[in-house]
From Swiss-Prot:
It comes from Borrelia turicatae (strain 91E135). This is Ribosomal RNA small subunit methyltransferase H. GO terms for cellular component: cytoplasm. It is found in: Cytoplasm. The lineage of its organism: Bacteria, Pseudomonadati, Spirochaetota, Spirochaetia, Spirochaetales. GO terms for molecular function: rRNA (cytosine-N4-)-methyltransferase activity. It catalyses: cytidine(1402) in 16S rRNA + S-adenosyl-L-methionine = N(4)-methylcytidine(1402) in 16S rRNA + S-adenosyl-L-homocysteine + H(+). S-adenosyl-L-methionine binds at G37, G38, H39, D56, F87, D102, H109.
């Protein structure tokens, strides 16, 4: 197995949440986005009486996690599926003590997957977390959607203020040839952007919008939220790490809508990475952690 590139985000804060939990034999920790097992590995090392359910739709990443967590064999159950599908079939009689959903993309996908998540790669513009399931790829969308549909997609799923300029450039390029690689798309978007100072790559929001659409990320989050809280045990905790305002708003509004008698929001404001974490892990800079506790059934 290649080196694990992904550094788990807000790990210390998540461990602190577990410290405050009443951990006893049979404690169940569900990692909804197992990735390469960073969070789960730390949890399993620290707590000998915790069992982990690890979920990931990407079978390649799941196999990497199995290798990295091999020392914990017998304490981890693996499920190769979307987290919303897993919880739609989860038996309510088997309650969960702690659910973690880190909604970020694994560094493996950016660095090693070959699926077009990274700006500067000359690889197929795909962006599907599980290509085997079929469905539209980013290549299909960027080369076939009409002007209005592309404008709406990019603006609504990222808030990109220059979506019209970007789409105009995309359509002009399509007259010459298809857009095949992330590098091509990044170049098109960057040239369409006005010459202003940015802290991020000009193509960041366009890539975000495509990835969200391709993997139906917002639908899966909205579907999962009620399933997650329903699956929690008394005093069970749900911790969600988001990476953009669309996800964060969905989680915030859902938490606010829950019964204050039955649930307690543990984060009036989201927990953000400390300056030190941002320095050694730049991928954490936009992370926000929101946490809720179930008081009783």
């Amino acid at each position: 197995m290649g080196n694990i590139f992904h550094i788990p985000v807000l790990l210390e804060e998540i461990i602190n949440l577990l410290e405050a939990s009443n951990i006893s034999d049979g404690f169940v920790f569900v990692d909804c986005t197992l990735g390469e097992g960073g969070h789960s590995s730390a949890v399993l090392k620290k707590y000998q009486n915790i069992n982990v359910i690890g979920i990931d739709r990407d079978d390649v990443v799941l196999n990497r996690a199995k290798e990295s967590l091999i020392e914990f064999k017998g304490r981890v159950s693996y499920f190769n599926t979307w987290f919303d599908d897993f919880f739609s079939e989860y038996p309510l009689s088997s309650k969960i003590n702690f659910i973690l959903a880190d909604l970020g993309i694994s560094m493996f996908h950016y660095k090693m997957s070959g699926r077009g998540f990274s700006f500067f790669e000359d690889e197929r513009l795909d962006m599907r977390l599980y290509p085997g399931a079929g469905g539209l790829s980013a290549y299909d969308i960027i080369n076939t959607f009409d002007k209005k549909r592309l404008e709406n997609l990019i603006y609504e799923l990222s808030g990109e203020r220059y979506s019209r300029r970007i789409v105009k450039s995309i359509l002009e390029y399509r007259k010459i040839k298809k857009i095949e690689t992330p590098r091509e798309l990044q170049d098109i978007v960057s040239k369409a952007y006005p010459r202003i100072k940015l802290k991020i790559n000009p193509a960041t929001k366009t890539f975000q919008a495509l990835r969200i659409y391709v993997n139906d990320e917002l639908f899966r989050l909205k579907r999962s939220l009620p399933l997650w809280v329903e699956s929690l045990s008394n005093n069970g905790v749900l911790a969600i790490v988001t990476f953009h305002s669309l996800e964060d708003k969905i989680v915030k509004e859902f938490f606010k809508g829950l019964s204050k008698d039955q649930y307690c929001i543990l984060t009036k404001k989201p927990i953000m990475p400390r300056c030190e974490e941002k320095r050694f892990n730049s991928a954490s800079r936009s992370a926000k952690l929101r946490v809720i506790k179930k008081l009783y059934e």
